[in-house]
Amino acid sequence: MSQTHLSNQKFADLPLHPEVKQALAENGFEFCTPIQALSLPVLLQSKDIAGQAQTGTGKTMAFLVATFNHLLSTPIPENRQLNQPRAIIMAPTRELAIQIAKDAILLAKHTHLKVGIVYGGESYDVQRKVLDQGVDILIGTTGRIIDYVRQGIISLNAIQAVVLDEADRMFDLGFIKDIRFLFRRMPNADQRLNMLFSATLSMKVQELAYDHMNDPVKVEIAPEEKTSKNIKEEIFYPSQEDKIRLLLTLIEEDWPEKAIVFSNTKHSCENLWSWLEGDGHRVGLLTGDVPQKKRIRILEQFTQGQLDILVATDVAARGLHISDVSHVYNYDLPDDCEDYVHRIGRTGRAGNKGVSVSFACEEYALNLPAIESYINHSIPVSNYDRDALLDDIPPPVKIHRKHPAGARNLRERSGAGRPQGAHRSGGRPPRHDRTRRQP
């Protein structure tokens, strides 16, 4: 983690429970990020917070540290039953819930607290067996949590800490009724520690906070900067017929270590995957139709470096927390301004540098003024030489519905795509030496 991303506040200097301090030290956490430095002193006084911070700022560890510390420092409720967790962490997507659980387990290893995770798309009975053994901290998506609550498998009567992560996405995905349903089944707000985090603290998010929290303290990290200074943004104005050639040329010349390509529709994503796969790239496809087990497998392949490029829609990519993404390509400009911020926020995390490349084509160019107004700056324009675009592109492959859109054994081709089994750090250089960016 880059030191430029950290504050001068040390975890060791905070009044944390000894077991939490030990867990942080053994996992290499010495200095707080800005959101941690601002939120933890408030939370350690048992005050609620509504925090605004961009993704990749360390907010997950902020609320996990506060949750573990609160449970370790607070007496267990009298007559607490085995099916009553003491803390609940709600996330908008399965992938985000899984990532939070992985981080929570790092802290749980040094405490007696048990962590459980529930989400849709996986075995109901397997997750229930974990709950039947009792958990202290329940992490999950609202739909599956509600299923277990309604069946009496879990009770929220002993909740002492609540986390609502990515609250703005909860609204986008229509989960607010579910959240209110769960809040109504917990002890009163003044009997628990409440934490809400969101990339944006819109009026509807603030209303939710004040309805279900106890006079929360508002914590903001650089709210005037909606995009990170670590991200180099640029935009092209390609014709519709040039778009795919331009994308393949940029990827060929940038040769990103790990890239996500966003498009606005499932059909467009499938088309992009076909072209990239045909060009020999190790590419995965994430749309709303991809089953959960396949999603997890594709994400693992991408995270572990077996895939270099991920093509995704906004809905399919929500909640993804993947480190070391070097490039984001907006093949289509999003219709929602906030989606632009969420998309490019997947690179340039934790103090690292990132690159965001956007296309303003005939169909979506009208979205640009609203996006630039929302982020409070103009995106630098880059031009390209049409004659310098790749002209030896292999045809797209057909999508085989019975096979995962993940890593496959790719055929070797002379002068096209990556050789089979090669990695970005050791693969071939771009097949053409050309300059596609012009002043």
From Swiss-Prot:
Reaction(s) catalysed (UniProt annotation): ATP + H2O = ADP + phosphate + H(+)
Keywords: ATP-binding, Cytoplasm, Helicase, Hydrolase, Nucleotide-binding, RNA-binding
Principal EC category: hydrolase
Domain of life: Bacteria
InterPro entries with a match to the protein in the record: DEAD/DEAH_box_helicase_dom, DEAD_box_RNA_helicase, Helicase_ATP-bd, Helicase_C-like, P-loop_NTPase, RNA-helicase_DEAD-box_CS, RNA_helicase_ATP-dep_RhlB, RNA_helicase_DEAD_Q_motif
Gene3D superfamilies per UniProt: P-loop containing nucleotide triphosphate hydrolases (3.40.50.300)
MF (Gene Ontology): ATP binding; ATP hydrolysis activity; RNA binding; RNA helicase activity
GO cellular component, one term: cytosol
Entry-linked Pfam families: DEAD, Helicase_C
Motif (DEAD box) on chain: 165-168
Ranges annotated as biased composition (Basic residues): 425-439
Parts forming coiled coils: none
Extent of motif Q motif: 9-37
EC identifiers of the protein: 3.6.4.13
Region (Disordered): 395-439
Positions bound to ATP: A53, Q54, T55, G56, T57, G58, K59, T60
Protein name: ATP-dependent RNA helicase RhlB
Organism per entry: Shewanella sp. (strain MR-4)
